[in-house]
Amino acid sequence: MSEAIDHNRRRVMVASLITLAAAGISKPGAVGAESSFSPADAQAQEKGALYGFGGANAWLNSPPLGAAELRGKVVLVQFWTYTCVNWLRTLPYLRAWTEKYKDHGLVVVGVHTPEFEFEKNLDNVRAALKDMRVTYPVAIDSSYMVWRAFSNNAWPAVYLIDARGRVRYRHLGEGEYEHTEQAIQQLLTEAGNADVAGGLVSVEARGVEAAADLASLRSGENYLGSERTENFASPGGKGYGQRRAYRVPDRLALNHWALRGDWTQAGGFVALNKPNGRIAYRFHARDVNLVMGPAVRGNAVRFRVLVDGKLPGAAHGVDVDEQGNGTVTGQRLYQLIRQSQPITDRQFEIEFLDSGVEAFAFTFG
């Protein structure tokens, strides 16, 4: 991963959001309500942004696009990475805008800049595009060249480029969908599209794409590898690449986590060496998600989840049944818990019935 990247960017945004939710303060948008719009006569970032696409490693869903191919178009550029839950929750809007404005001069371009090493695998990205019904052009930015050309520093991030090639709008994080769509309409109108459809799209987001329950959110993203993890509570502390037998303490404080069984805690993930290893996490949120995958491509790892020592029942996520059973088949984000009100502090446990799983990060919603 490039040293220019702030690996904590999403986590800082989520932490700010949790603080606002806990204080009962409302704020437009979700994660990281950072946005700006430049009028046509302002000192908007001059041309060059579209030339940044020349740094892409590959293109999916489209031949390579650049300034020549996009001349005269309004371009929505979104930086994303396929395991990012914050990006997943923006996806219904990206699909809707693509469909609504495709005949009015809008071109949506996704820039896939990976956070985890396995996200550089093109087969993984192709599978994600198919599973998530992403049909618009995607630039593969594994070398971070496009990211740096835009001076970007967050997932997800939206940039709107006008028909003259100038960056006129930027929004970092989730939310602000009304403002973003209004900016799209304005730039399309400026470009001479007199019949731009008015109003705002209405989306019905389901599963992992549903908006976070901000009022109940008290848990933020946490990585599991020794380099970036927080609140690791197993006796003996972090493993730093060593194979160890871990145990879960009798009690976990909120947002603390622990391992049980034979694990190796590498810098960026934890890897299970023997069957029946567990991860326990004390959380306060509607949703529990875990980025994980088999250590060997093509293998399947069975797991079972419990909440407060009980089967999840109706609180199961989309990747788990009511008895808590699921299977890790690919390297992606798995939604394990989606519970209803009331939301309280609860203890989550996932037991892997087979060895050979790698777990990277928890996210909540």
Model-derived segments and spans:
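N-terminal secretory signal peptides and thylakoid transit peptides that target proteins
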Residues: 2-20
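Non-globular targeting/processing and membrane-anchoring segments
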Residues: 13-15, 48-54, 181-365
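N-terminal "domain-start" segment that seeds a small globular fold
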Residues: 34-68
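Short active-site neighborhood of thiol/selenol oxidoreductases, capturing the structured segment around
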Residues: 66-85, 108
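Loop/turn elements at helix/coil->beta-strand transitions in domains of secreted/extracellular proteins
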Residues: 72-75, 104-107, 134-136, 163
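Structural microenvironment flanking redox-active thiols in thiol-disulfide oxidoreductases
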Residues: 88-132, 142-146, 301-303
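Short, internal strand/loop/helix patches
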Residues: 123-161, 290
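Non-catalytic, surface beta->alpha helical segment in thiol-disulfide oxidoreductase systems
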Residues: 167-188
